[in-house]
């Protein structure tokens, strides 16, 4: 069984990485990988415009920076958390209880022959 030198293995890995770096720097690595940053930038711009549409209170027609858009999103999320943390208001007359058919007066109960809505 042969023993491998850990130093030599690291050296080969570094050489391989530096050769790839030089190839990319010289432009030999252009292709889908070179187009990736542009598509990512387009995706991020789309996300910022989508956030701008979704958050209420962002004035239309004014130019906001990405930081300002994010700050408005954060403020909106905090406002939603405050609203959700508040107890839900109860009905003003007290709690609603289900009404049984037997508790209704006879004129309010619809008989089976009157349930037809068509003439």
From Swiss-Prot:
Expressed abundantly in lung, kidney and adrenal gland, but not in adult brain. Pfam families: HLH. The keyword Transcription applies. It comes from the Eukaryota. GO terms for cellular component: cytoplasm; nucleoplasm; nucleus. Keywords: Biological rhythms, Myogenesis, Nucleus, Repressor, Transcription, Transcription regulation. Residues 28-80 form the bHLH domain. Induction: By phorbol 12-myristate 13-acetate (PMA). GO terms for molecular function: bHLH transcription factor binding; leptomycin B binding; protein dimerization activity; protein domain specific binding; transcription corepressor activity; transcription regulator inhibitor activity. One of its GO terms (biological process) is negative regulation of myoblast differentiation. Its main location: nucleus. Gene3D superfamilies: Helix-loop-helix DNA-binding domain. The keyword Nucleus applies. It is found in: Nucleus. InterPro entries: bHLH_dom, DNA-bd_prot-inh, HLH_DNA-bd_sf. Transcriptional regulator (lacking a basic DNA binding domain) which negatively regulates the basic helix-loop-helix (bHLH) transcription factors by forming heterodimers and inhibiting their DNA binding and transcriptional activity. Implicated in regulating a variety of cellular processes, including cellular growth, senescence, differentiation, apoptosis, angiogenesis, and neoplastic transformation. Involved in myogenesis by inhibiting skeletal muscle and cardiac myocyte differentiation and promoting muscle precursor cells proliferation. Homodimer, and heterodimer with other HLH proteins. Interacts with COPS5 and COPS7A. Interacts with IFI204. Interacts with GATA4 and NKX2-5. Interacts with ANKRD2; both proteins cooperate in myoblast differentiation. Interacts with CLOCK and BMAL1. This is DNA-binding protein inhibitor ID-3. It comes from Homo sapiens (Human).
């Amino acid at each position: 069984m042969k023993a491998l030198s850990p130093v030599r293995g690291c050296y080969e890995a570094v050489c391989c990485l530096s050769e790839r770096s030089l190839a990319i720097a010289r432009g030999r690595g252009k292709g889908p990988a070179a187009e990736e940053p542009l598509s990512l930038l387009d995706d991020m711009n789309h996300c910022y415009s989508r956030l701008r549409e979704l958050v209420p209170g962002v004035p239309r027609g004014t130019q906001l920076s990405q930081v300002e858009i994010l700050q408005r999103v954060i403020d909106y999320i905090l406002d939603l958390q405050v609203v959700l943390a508040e107890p839900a208001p109860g009905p003003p007359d007290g709690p609603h209880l289900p009404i049984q058919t037997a508790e209704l007066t006879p004129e309010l109960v619809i008989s089976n022959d009157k349930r037809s809505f068509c003439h």
